[in-house]
Amino acid sequence: MVSKKVYFLTSNPHKAKEVSDVLSQFSIEVVPLKGEKLEIQADSVEEVARFAAEEAKKRFKERPLLLEDSGLFVDALKGFPGPYSNYVYRTLGLEGLLKLMEGVEDRRARFVCAAALVKEDDKIVIEVGEVEGEIAYEPRGDKGFGFDPIFVPLGYEKTFAELGEEVKKRISHRARAFMKIAKHLSGE
């Protein structure tokens, strides 16, 4: 039974499904809202998400409104690609990032998601979710998207793309951020 409906601004159907899977556990229905979120170049996904939420609340009337920004932060690359992950994925791809990691022993990395909620009263709430892990030596698996085939979450031997949706919707950075958002939605 659905107790609440929210709108999720994204152009990525994979993210829409992941967020829907997470929030459905809290009886929250996610309605994808087509449109581009306006982004700034910033050093943190939180800054990008906050700016995008401020802009989205001016352009869209639907409430509550959700959006997110996320990034892969690789320790040996001083946090790169971080908030530029989408651009790096589109231009360099998995192989390009792996090339940057050639000969690098320190494979530690983390995915960070900043989920933004524009509430009924137009107040903005930002919640952050993180998952620690490491960069694999080659792409593995076909169940994910983005950098999932090269990210092995801490405590696992498989990449996100090998683990699949059932595990990812419990442990991913996006799942962790939106589980926190669910508490705000339940209390509204």
From Swiss-Prot:
Coiled coil segments of this chain: none
Cofactor dependence: Mg(2+)
TM spans (from-to): none
Catalytic reaction(s) noted: XTP + H2O = XMP + diphosphate + H(+); dITP + H2O = dIMP + diphosphate + H(+); ITP + H2O = IMP + diphosphate + H(+)
E.C. numbers: 3.6.1.66
Keywords: Hydrolase, Magnesium, Metal-binding, Nucleotide metabolism, Nucleotide-binding
Cofactor: binding comment: Binds 1 Mg(2+) ion per subunit.
Protein name: dITP/XTP pyrophosphatase
Record organism: Ignicoccus hospitalis (strain KIN4/I / DSM 18386 / JCM 14125)
